[in-house]
C-alpha cells in the first residue's frame, strides 16, 4: 500500500461497471465516477444532491455512487464494529463488511481512506483526482478501521486537516465538491477555477464587492 506521502494517482485504464444512479438522476455518459463507502451513505448522497453537485449529477458530469457498508454484514444485528484487541476506549470498524462492500461494488481506484494520518488534501490533490476517470472514498467511524483495511485494501489515506470528526462523511463531501468543480462543464463560468483562490497563481483571490456602491457609509474602492 502506498505511504501517506505517496502521490495518489487515478488509474486511467480502470473500466467502470454499470451501476444505478440516485433516483431522479440520469445515467452519466462520461461523468467522473466517485464511489463512497460509508455507514451513513445518505449523509453524502443528500449533500451531493444540492447546488453545484446536484446539477453536475443531473447533467451527467458526476457519477456518484454511495454504498452502505452495513449491507455486507453477516449477522442478524448487522454488526459493523467490535472492541479492539488489547482493550481501550471506543470500537473499531470490522474488516469483513468493508472488504466485501468494496469487492461487490468493484469501484474505481484509487480507493482512499479518509483519516487524520494521510496526505493532506489540498487544491493540487483535487486537481490530480479531477484529471482522472474516477476514484473512491472510504469513510471511517468510531475509533477507525481495522488496520488490515489500511494494509490490504485501500490505496492511500487522505486527511482534510488536523481536526477530529465523528466520521469521514463530512470530509468526503469536501473532497467531492473540490474535485467536481474542477471538471470541465461543472462551473457556470470556466474562468472561475482559474481566477479564484488557489487557482493558477496559487494565491488567495482579491476582495470582492457588489451593489450598492455605498453601504452604511462604507464605499467600494475605486477600480
Where in the sequence are the language-model features?
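S-adenosyl-L-methionine/SAH cofactor-binding core of RNA-modifying enzymes
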Residues: 92-141, 147
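Short glycine-enriched loops at secondary-structure junctions
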Residues: 69-72, 141-145
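Short, solvent-exposed amphipathic alpha-helical segments in soluble enzyme
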Residues: 51-56, 127-131, 152-153
Amino acid at each position: 500500500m502506498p505511504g501517506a506521502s505517496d502521490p495518489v494517482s487515478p488509474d486511467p485504464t480502470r473500466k467502470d461497471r454499470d451501476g444505478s444512479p440516485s433516483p431522479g438522476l440520469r445515467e452519466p455518459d462520461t461523468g467522473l465516477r466517485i464511489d463512497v463507502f460509508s455507514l451513513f451513505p445518505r449523509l453524502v448522497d443528500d449533500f451531493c444532491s444540492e447546488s453545484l453537485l446536484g446539477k453536475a449529477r443531473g447533467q451527467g458530469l458526476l457519477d456518484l455512487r454511495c454504498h452502505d457498508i452495513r449491507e455486507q454484514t453477516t449477522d442478524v444485528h448487522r454488526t459493523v464494529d467490535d472492541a479492539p484487541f488489547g482493550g481501550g476506549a471506543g470500537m473499531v470498524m470490522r474488516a469483513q463488511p468493508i472488504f466485501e462492500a468494496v469487492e461487490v461494488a468493484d469501484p474505481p481506484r484509487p480507493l482512499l481512506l479518509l483519516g487524520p494520518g494521510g496526505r493532506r488534501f489540498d487544491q493540487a490533490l483535487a486537481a490530480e483526482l479531477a484529471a482522472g476517470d474516477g476514484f473512491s472514498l472510504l469513510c471511517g467511524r468510531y475509533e477507525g478501521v481495522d488496520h488490515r483495511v489500511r494494509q490490504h485494501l485501500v490505496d492511500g489515506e487522505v486527511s482534510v486537516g488536523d481536526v477530529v470528526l465523528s466520521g469521514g462523511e463530512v470530509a468526503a463531501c469536501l473532497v467531492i465538491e473540490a474535485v467536481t468543480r474542477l471538471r470541465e462543464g461543472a462551473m457556470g463560468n470556466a474562468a472561475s477555477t482559474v481566477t479564484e483562490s488557489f487557482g493558477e497563481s496559487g494565491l488567495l483571490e482579491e476582495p470582492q464587492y457588489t451593489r450598492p456602491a455605498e453601504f452604511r457609509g462604507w464605499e467600494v474602492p475605486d477600480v
